[in-house]
Amino acid sequence: MRTTFMAKANEVERKWYVVDAEGQTLGRLASEVASILRGKNKPTFTPHVDTGDHVIIINAEKIHLTGNKLNDKIYYRHTNHPGGLKQRTALEMRTNYPVQMLELAIKGMLPKGRLGRQVSKKLNVYAGAEHPHQAQKPEVYELRG
Protein backbone atom coordinates (compact mmCIF):
# COMPACT_ATOMS: atom_id res chain seq x y z
CA MET A 1 0.00 0.00 0.00
CA ARG A 2 1.31 3.45 -0.91
CA THR A 3 1.30 6.38 1.44
CA THR A 4 0.24 9.88 0.51
CA PHE A 5 3.10 12.37 0.21
CA MET A 6 3.01 15.12 2.83
CA ALA A 7 5.46 17.98 2.43
CA LYS A 8 7.36 19.16 5.48
CA ALA A 9 7.91 22.88 6.01
CA ASN A 10 11.69 22.59 6.41
CA GLU A 11 12.09 20.54 3.20
CA VAL A 12 10.30 22.97 0.86
CA GLU A 13 12.52 24.76 -1.66
CA ARG A 14 11.23 28.25 -2.31
CA LYS A 15 11.82 30.26 -5.48
CA TRP A 16 11.46 34.01 -6.00
CA TYR A 17 9.28 35.26 -8.86
CA VAL A 18 8.82 38.76 -10.31
CA VAL A 19 5.40 39.57 -11.75
CA ASP A 20 4.86 42.74 -13.79
CA ALA A 21 1.36 44.11 -13.09
CA GLU A 22 1.41 46.63 -15.95
CA GLY A 23 -1.77 46.20 -18.01
CA GLN A 24 -2.89 43.13 -16.02
CA THR A 25 -6.46 42.80 -14.72
CA LEU A 26 -6.59 43.04 -10.92
CA GLY A 27 -8.58 39.90 -10.09
CA ARG A 28 -6.89 37.64 -12.63
CA LEU A 29 -3.45 38.70 -11.42
CA ALA A 30 -4.47 38.33 -7.76
CA SER A 31 -5.84 34.80 -8.17
CA GLU A 32 -2.74 33.55 -9.94
CA VAL A 33 -0.37 35.18 -7.42
CA ALA A 34 -2.41 33.72 -4.52
CA SER A 35 -2.01 30.29 -6.09
CA ILE A 36 1.79 30.72 -6.33
CA LEU A 37 1.99 31.97 -2.74
CA ARG A 38 0.13 28.88 -1.48
CA GLY A 39 2.17 26.51 -3.66
CA LYS A 40 -0.78 25.13 -5.61
CA ASN A 41 1.28 25.20 -8.81
CA LYS A 42 3.65 22.55 -7.38
CA PRO A 43 3.14 18.78 -7.40
CA THR A 44 4.21 18.72 -3.72
CA PHE A 45 1.30 20.94 -2.58
CA THR A 46 0.07 20.07 0.89
CA PRO A 47 -2.96 22.00 2.19
CA HIS A 48 -1.78 22.42 5.78
CA VAL A 49 1.87 23.30 4.98
CA ASP A 50 3.26 26.50 3.47
CA THR A 51 4.76 25.12 0.24
CA GLY A 52 4.55 28.35 -1.78
CA ASP A 53 7.12 30.65 -3.33
CA HIS A 54 7.99 34.30 -2.80
CA VAL A 55 6.37 36.78 -5.21
CA ILE A 56 7.50 40.31 -6.06
CA ILE A 57 4.93 42.43 -7.91
CA ILE A 58 6.17 45.55 -9.70
CA ASN A 59 4.25 48.37 -11.43
CA ALA A 60 1.25 48.06 -9.10
CA GLU A 61 0.21 51.60 -10.06
CA LYS A 62 -0.43 50.42 -13.65
CA ILE A 63 -2.95 47.69 -12.76
CA HIS A 64 -6.10 47.53 -14.91
CA LEU A 65 -9.72 47.26 -13.79
CA THR A 66 -12.44 46.27 -16.24
CA GLY A 67 -15.75 48.01 -16.78
CA ASN A 68 -16.58 51.07 -14.69
CA LYS A 69 -14.99 49.69 -11.51
CA LEU A 70 -12.55 52.60 -11.17
CA ASN A 71 -15.49 54.81 -10.21
CA ASP A 72 -18.01 52.26 -8.90
CA LYS A 73 -15.88 49.94 -6.73
CA ILE A 74 -15.60 51.24 -3.17
CA TYR A 75 -13.11 50.12 -0.51
CA TYR A 76 -14.42 50.42 3.05
CA ARG A 77 -12.46 50.57 6.30
CA HIS A 78 -13.38 51.48 9.87
CA THR A 79 -11.39 53.50 12.39
CA ASN A 80 -12.96 51.63 15.35
CA HIS A 81 -14.50 54.87 16.59
CA PRO A 82 -18.24 55.58 16.43
CA GLY A 83 -19.17 56.86 12.98
CA GLY A 84 -15.69 56.05 11.70
CA LEU A 85 -16.60 54.25 8.47
CA LYS A 86 -14.32 55.55 5.71
CA GLN A 87 -14.55 54.81 2.01
CA ARG A 88 -12.38 55.26 -1.07
CA THR A 89 -13.07 54.55 -4.72
CA ALA A 90 -10.82 52.24 -6.72
CA LEU A 91 -9.51 55.28 -8.63
CA GLU A 92 -8.34 56.91 -5.37
CA MET A 93 -6.80 53.62 -4.24
CA ARG A 94 -4.95 53.09 -7.52
CA THR A 95 -3.69 56.69 -7.54
CA ASN A 96 -2.69 57.02 -3.87
CA TYR A 97 -2.37 53.47 -2.48
CA PRO A 98 -1.69 51.02 -5.35
CA VAL A 99 0.29 48.64 -3.12
CA GLN A 100 -2.54 48.36 -0.60
CA MET A 101 -5.07 47.78 -3.38
CA LEU A 102 -3.17 44.76 -4.71
CA GLU A 103 -2.41 43.40 -1.24
CA LEU A 104 -6.10 43.53 -0.27
CA ALA A 105 -7.10 41.67 -3.44
CA ILE A 106 -4.49 38.93 -2.96
CA LYS A 107 -4.89 38.51 0.81
CA GLY A 108 -8.64 38.11 0.33
CA MET A 109 -7.89 35.00 -1.76
CA LEU A 110 -5.62 33.41 0.85
CA PRO A 111 -6.75 31.26 3.80
CA LYS A 112 -7.93 33.11 6.88
CA GLY A 113 -5.89 32.03 9.90
CA ARG A 114 -2.32 31.26 10.89
CA LEU A 115 -1.33 29.69 7.55
CA GLY A 116 -2.78 32.61 5.58
CA ARG A 117 -0.83 35.15 7.64
CA GLN A 118 2.36 33.15 7.15
CA VAL A 119 1.79 32.85 3.38
CA SER A 120 1.02 36.56 2.96
CA LYS A 121 4.45 37.49 4.37
CA LYS A 122 6.00 36.15 1.15
CA LEU A 123 4.25 38.82 -0.93
CA ASN A 124 6.18 41.97 -1.85
CA VAL A 125 4.35 44.67 -3.84
CA TYR A 126 5.96 47.82 -5.27
CA ALA A 127 4.24 50.72 -7.03
CA GLY A 128 7.09 51.36 -9.47
CA ALA A 129 9.38 49.19 -11.59
CA GLU A 130 12.21 49.01 -9.02
CA HIS A 131 12.49 46.48 -6.18
CA PRO A 132 15.25 45.78 -3.61
CA HIS A 133 15.28 41.98 -4.04
CA GLN A 134 17.98 41.61 -6.73
CA ALA A 135 20.12 39.50 -4.36
CA GLN A 136 17.49 36.74 -4.38
CA LYS A 137 17.84 36.40 -8.19
CA PRO A 138 14.09 36.30 -8.90
CA GLU A 139 12.76 34.67 -12.06
CA VAL A 140 10.29 36.50 -14.29
CA TYR A 141 6.89 34.80 -14.05
CA GLU A 142 4.71 34.91 -17.15
CA LEU A 143 1.02 34.98 -16.34
CA ARG A 144 -1.39 32.74 -18.23
CA GLY A 145 -3.64 34.34 -20.82
Curated annotation (Swiss-Prot):
Its GO CC terms are: cytosolic large ribosomal subunit; ribosome
Q: Which InterPro entries match?
A: Ribosomal_uL13 (IPR005822), Ribosomal_uL13_bac-type (IPR005823), Ribosomal_uL13_CS (IPR023563), Ribosomal_uL13_sf (IPR036899)
Task: Please name the PROSITE patterns in this protein's record.
Answer: RIBOSOMAL_L13 (PS00783)
Q: Which terms does the UniProt entry file under GO BP?
A: negative regulation of translation; translation
Asked if the Swiss-Prot or TrEMBL record annotates the protein with the keyword Isomerase, the reply is no
- What keywords sit in the KW lines? Ribonucleoprotein, Ribosomal protein
GO MF terms held by the record: mRNA binding; structural constituent of ribosome
Record note on quaternary structure: Part of the 50S ribosomal subunit.
Name the NCBIfam families for this protein: rplM_bact (TIGR01066)
Q: What does this protein's UniProt record list under function?
A: This protein is one of the early assembly proteins of the 50S ribosomal subunit, although it is not seen to bind rRNA by itself. It is important during the early stages of 50S assembly.
Q: Which family does it belong to?
A: Belongs to the universal ribosomal protein uL13 family.
Protein name as it appears in the record: Large ribosomal subunit protein uL13
**What organism is this sequence from?**
Bacillus cereus (strain ATCC 14579 / DSM 31 / CCUG 7414 / JCM 2152 / NBRC 15305 / NCIMB 9373 / NCTC 2599 / NRRL B-3711)
